[in-house]
Design a protein with these regions (language model features):
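FIC/Doc superfamily catalytic core
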Residues: 1-349
């Protein structure tokens, strides 16, 4: 059966089903003509496109077609939500949003080791093609991050919820694993940590929050994001607000993987809601970025339900300064686009 025919058959199956179906149910009904990995990829794409709703986690995950438009995420209009797009012609708005998407996606995935260049990223996202000689994994990461940005944009006009965070995680985690110890779209179930070498050449092991404490700690992060008023975020303090949220999520490390990309996405929510462009950490600053994160986390120690997410806010100053130094690339893109807009206005277009 051709791929397009398979996909159509599965969507029809979900629409006609009397209730939610598990991955095993779907595979059985199509006589296992598509692999579990392929099915997960298609289902994730449909979920991001508001065609399918996912419930549960791990082996108990089920899928159901969205038949009621009220269940779907409403269409997103960037021109209505982002003040940094104001006064731009529609075509220039699209150009700027695509430039930000490409830069944000390239930078965030490159910080995690992705080998695709900015040009490669643009080519993949604009043309939908592959770059010869580059790993499929890298292509999937780029497409997944771009999809996550769309999910974020669609939800920017409502309070952040666990469901949105889990949807973002499913978008960025493009390696589909049937492993109960590596849940996708759910909090981690095993303890995690990382071995680092600081700028002083001293080796350390950072222990992230235990799975037991993740729900309460992430609820604190959610509350902080939702409590941030759009009137409280300005160009002058945007990096400080971004740094606090980013550090909190990175220090909790709530997922088995994908924590950095999720932190960099969620930390931009207050900025975007306030009409500011996202803060993008350049890949060239990767070492300083990791060292600054690690220095704070080693100093604070492992987070618990009693410590809270930010037990010593004063120690965030170095990371705040680092983030402020990174808040330039998207502003530069804006300036170039507005130069074009002013040029058009001067010519009477």
């Amino acid at each position: 059966m051709a791929k397009s025919t398979q996909k159509h058959a599965i969507l029809t199956l979900l629409k006609q089903a009397s209730g939610p179906l598990s991955l095993r149910d779907i595979a059985s009904k199509i006589n296992h003509e598509a692999s579990s990995r392929t099915l997960r990829r298609w289902l994730a794409d449909w979920e991001a496109g508001n065609k399918v709703k996912r419930s549960g986690a791990g082996p108990s995950t089920t899928y159901q077609a969205i038949s009621n438009p009220a269940e779907a995420v409403p269409p997103f209009s960037a021109s209505d939500s982002f003040a940094f797009l104001a006064d731009l012609d529609p075509d220039l708005r699209r150009v700027l949003l695509n430039q930000i998407r490409d830069l944000w996606t390239h930078s965030s995935t490159a910080l995690e080791g992705n080998t695709l260049s900015l040009g490669d990223t643009h080519f993949i996202l604009e043309q939908g093609l592959t770059v010869s000689g580059k790993p499929i994994k890298d292509h999937q990461e780029v497409r997944g991050h771009a999809r996550a940005i769309e999910v974020l944009y669609q939800c920017i006009d409502r309070p952040l919820s666990h469901d949105v965070i889990f949807a973002l995680h499913r978008a960025v985690q493009t390696e589909y694993l049937d492993d109960i110890y590596k849940p996708i779209g759910a909090w981690k179930v095993e303890a995690n940590g990382t071995h680092v070498v600081g700028s002083d050449n001293k080796q350390s092991f950072i222990e992230y929050a235990l799975p037991l404490f993740v729900p309460k700690l992430m609820a604190e992060v959610l509350d902080a994001i939702n409590a941030t008023s759009v009137d409280d975020v300005t160009l002058d303090n945007a990096a400080v607000i971004y740094a606090k949220i980013h550090m909190g999520i990175a220090h909790i490390h709530p997922f088995y993987d994908g924590n950095g990309r999720i932190a960099r996405l969620l930390a931009n929510i207050p900025l975007l809601k306030s009409g500011l462009p996202p803060l993008v950490i350049p890949k060239e600053q990767r070492r300083v970025y990791i060292e600054t994160l690690s220095k704070y986390q080693i100093s604070i120690g492992q987070l618990t339900s009693t410590s809270g997410v930010w037990p010593a806010p004063d120690q965030l100053r170095e990371f705040e300064a680092f983030c402020a130094s990174c808040y330039g690339s998207t502003k530069d893109l804006m300036e170039e686009i507005f130069k074009l807009q002013r040029k058009r206005a001067g010519k009477g277009f």
